[in-house]
Amino acid sequence: MSKLEAILSQEVEAEIQALLQEAEAKAEAVKREAEEKAKALLQARERALEAQYRAALRRAESAGELLVATARTQARGEVLEEVRRRVREALEALPQKPEWPEVVRKLALEALEALPGAKALVANPEDLPHLEALARERGVELQAEPALRLGVRAVGAEGKTQVENSLLARLDRAWDALSSKVAQALWG
């Protein structure tokens, strides 16, 4: 090989080596850039997943808290309904108690006071004997109504005006206030 060929061959070889080094450097730079982008993308994705996880965890905790609150509210409602049922049972048992004649008489007095000039007093047939003396004293007629329980009804002239005074109606009217007091006593 001639000297010229050797020089050309060396130059070509040097140029090839330079191109290879440049290509390797560019490839290394591209690789580094790609790795940095991939790392940044991976970190961003990890942060997004972590944020999604925290949000899902907060939603699950909120849902759990809501379920617990709902269960507590439902349980409290059931307890209050049980209290109300027992109070009704106690009221319904009053006619068998020795103090019932005095209770029904007081209910009748309150009804008559609320309706001055009443002409009749209506009560359950079983309660009429307890009200006979009061009816004579007040000059009102006694009338039987089997459906009327735990109370009385004063009836005005011509039957247009009536005042009912029963323990169950009183319980119904007072239940909101009573139930809040019961709840306060039970749960603070």
UniProtKB/Swiss-Prot annotation:
One of its GO terms (cellular component) is proton-transporting two-sector ATPase complex, catalytic domain. This is V-type ATP synthase subunit E. Belongs to the V-ATPase E subunit family. One of its GO terms (biological process) is proton motive force-driven plasma membrane ATP synthesis. The lineage of its organism: Bacteria, Thermotogati, Deinococcota, Deinococci, Thermales. Pfam families: vATP-synt_E (PF01991). Gene3D superfamilies: ATP synthase, E subunit, C-terminal, F1F0 ATP synthase subunit B, membrane domain. Keywords: ATP synthesis, Hydrogen ion transport, Ion transport, Transport. GO terms for molecular function: ATP binding; proton-transporting ATP synthase activity, rotational mechanism; proton-transporting ATPase activity, rotational mechanism. It comes from Thermus thermophilus (strain ATCC 27634 / DSM 579 / HB8). Produces ATP from ADP in the presence of a proton gradient across the membrane. SUPFAM superfamilies: V-type ATPase subunit E-like.
